[in-house]
Amino acid sequence: MRSMKRFLPYLSVLTAMLIWSASGIAIKEALVVLPPMTMIVLRFSLAILLMLLIGLCAPRNSMFALQKPSKKDLPLFILGGIFQPFLYYILETYSYDALSSPTIAEALLSTSPVLAPFFAAVLLREHISIFNILGILISTVGMLLLVLVGASDFSIGNPWGIAFAFAAVSTAVLYTIVLRRIPSRYNPLSVVFYVQLSALVLFVPLCACTDGISGFTRLTQASPDLLCHTLGAVAYLAVGASVIAFICFCYTVRVIGVTRTNAFNNVRPAFTAIWMLLFFGEQLPWAKWVGILCIIIGLFVCQIVQSPKK
């Protein structure tokens, strides 16, 4: 039992990364019918309704019961929602739009493990060991091999795209910092619920300005087959990517810390490559398998705990 509890944070974050690694496929499927902002609002609305239903039906003292936040903690939940998903999704979209190569955008957006130790050390006084740094570097090399090997377009495009990408990564890391600051008395479901509710309050007026009601009327104009695929993709994003994955990630951040949790972001391209191999038959060259191996080795090295010197 104790052994299972010890490995639960790692199993939890790997589950989150596995779900998020397939979310790109679901997003592309949903965007065939829905505009981006409409898709985001629909996704998070369904996620919040699901969490509300679970939270209200769960026994009062269970880990899935929805807890009422105190007034002094509300700013943390709101700040978390501003950082991610609100700012992150907007900056990520602009970075993909400004950079001519999706490959470069994906590589830049995968640098959160590199930035996380510096944010955690400065803002949380989190101890960073040589193993953390070494593991992150090894897994980042693996991530770059996965993303860049076989890519045909390395042009940058608008330099602002680089700034948007790094700003997006910074907001993602700051989100994990906020998660660490939220008092441990709140369970992960309550944390994710209030964070995403804060973001949805910001997304709705933005959606009204950009898409209006026309974004939702596209669902009525789609063919039955296309509608089924779109709703299935949105359901996956709502239940899987926005509820299960966020709760799993939140739990891990609060148990093992910002640096060690963010290191697992490097495994997402590896999972994506495996999804593409299994479902689309996309073959992986040997260099990408080396990249996957580097990511796994780097993650093991990063998780080595070294006590700070007294």
PLM regions with names:
Residues 40-42, 102-111, 177-201, 238-277:
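Helix-helix packing/entry segments at the starts of transmembrane helices
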Residues 19, 23-24, 52, 56-109, ...:
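Specific transmembrane alpha-helical segments of multi-pass solute transporters/efflux pumps
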Residues 25, 51, 116-118, 122, ...:
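Transmembrane alpha-helical segments that form core, pore/gating elements
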